[in-house]
């Protein structure tokens, strides 16, 4: 699991959309930054950190800085994926809980939101009218959405989110003595 102790603090470098009509094989390289790939169509066969994967439509993959990655087989048919290069101010770490960003290295999007936000990031990065901060905010939103999808899929809900949900129940519904317990409050 890729983790960060704090939100924000991301340096965005560039992003784009690779499209190939067939026989694409990812070149062998080592990047000094993080790479995030999100597949729109087709399948990308790639090795990174000694692990071979076939990344299909609707799936994402993080490639770590300093690790060699390369294609392991040519693509069949059309291939299209979005990619972004970035670095955090505070290095990501391997961990599991208590982190602002909690990102599996590889996963499947459970909604269309990931693709929509990623396209916004690519679009913002291509327009000169946007500030650097706006592009970094789009990247933050993408990583936050990936984190939220992961937490939702694991059935884990951070304490502040549980508290917010309980507050909504109080605001829109009836008050119950069980609400503080649902938010994780433990009486003395």
Where are these regions (language model features)?
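N-terminal regulatory/effector-sensing and dimerization cores
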Residues: 11-100
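Generic structural signal for secondary-structure transition and capping sites
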Residues: 20, 44, 126, 151, ...
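Amphipathic alpha-helical segments enriched in hydrophobic/aromatic residues interleaved with Lys/Arg
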Residues: 95-160, 166-173
């Amino acid at each position: 699991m890729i983790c960060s102790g704090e939100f924000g603090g991301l340096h965005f470098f560039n992003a784009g959309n690779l499209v190939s009509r067939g026989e694409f094989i990812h070149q062998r390289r080592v990047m000094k930054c993080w790479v995030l790939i999100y597949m729109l169509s087709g399948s990308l066969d790639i090795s990174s950190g000694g692990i071979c994967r076939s990344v299909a439509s609707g799936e994402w993959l993080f490639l770590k800085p300093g690790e060699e990655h390369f294609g392991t087989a040519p693509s069949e048919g059309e291939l299209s994926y979005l990619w972004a290069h970035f670095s955090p101010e505070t290095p990501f770490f391997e961990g599991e809980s208590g982190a602002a960003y909690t990102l599996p290295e590889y996963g499947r999007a459970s909604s269309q939101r990931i693709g929509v936000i990623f396209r916004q990031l690519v679009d913002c990065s291509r327009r000169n009218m946007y500030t650097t901060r706006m592009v970094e905010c789009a990247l933050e939103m993408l990583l936050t959405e990936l984190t939220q999808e992961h937490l939702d899929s694991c059935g884990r809900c951070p304490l502040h989110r549980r508290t917010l949900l309980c507050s909504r129940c109080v605001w829109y519904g009836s008050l119950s003595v069980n609400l503080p317990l649902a938010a994780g409050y433990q009486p003395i």
